[in-house]
């Protein structure tokens, strides 16, 4: 039988994490007792005479699962680590019918809430938003109920569509075929997965782009792919931009968390976007070694973009007065983009520097350059992401090329 990926943490665990994992194991043990009489199975699958439900795929996470009746399933979705943790509850599982019966799924989120509207797919590749009539959410958003009509074929149900390690590998391989782009393994994650970078030809100035520090933030990953596609295009603008700036991309910083269906952390129990300063985790350490190497080569950082997702699209930037220049790069860039897509809702959200050890604060405090967190709303239409990301990329390139 399959074993749960949820128990695959490695490395030394802090006492609080041991306690939390003990609680989760107790929940599973309790579910196992029920399973003996109900016919349900836990770990990364459960089943009845009506259907089999499993999460035995990259990005899968169903927490504790049991059939309370042959056609009713209860899920308890818990974070990978004890709070405090961002309450972005992730779930992703596959329902394989054995009989053609309607099924009700009830997801209870522990230390989290129903942040994401469920998406469904018959093949794990093409996704759509589940119809409103099939979903209900409790007033406090702690319980999500899904009613599925009779069906005979398997169905993936997920907080967001899957964008997993294999998808990144294929995408990065296609980008690495560009004559100006090289691929480099910077290091390994806690579970031994490669931390891959794409690097263009060396120039006096460098632009950094990062992604997927937080596993559930799919829309940020989609935006980054479309944005980067424009940077590597064959337009006069893109060619001029690459002729001046070296590009360093690390699109998948947390491959272990993505594979395990985590809410936030890597396998070390750390929010990687709070490790830019301590540099305690191998994923961030590997990137820091590359940054040090580029610094030692005398190449000047000019911009950092870090792609994420949140409830509403926004760009976290520095305050205009944080720079000596007359022109505020971020405002200029975003104003130009807005003129070309006035129908796309996003916020320019300048913030004062803080002590939070994230990518944005690290690059600003270290290099005094524009360092921007590029956030795309969770439920933004995917067609709008594909349409607007290249425009953001074009206007970024124009503004950067105008700067001294």
Label each PLM-derived region with a short phrase.
Residues 42-144, 151:
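Extreme N-terminal flexible tails
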Residues 24-35:
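Sec-dependent signal peptide recognition
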Residues 139-179:
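Extended acidic/polar, glycine-enriched regions
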Residues 1-22:
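N-terminal secretory signal peptides that target proteins for export/translocation
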Residues 180-196, 202-347, 369-378:
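Active-site/substrate-binding loop(s) of hydrolase catalytic cores
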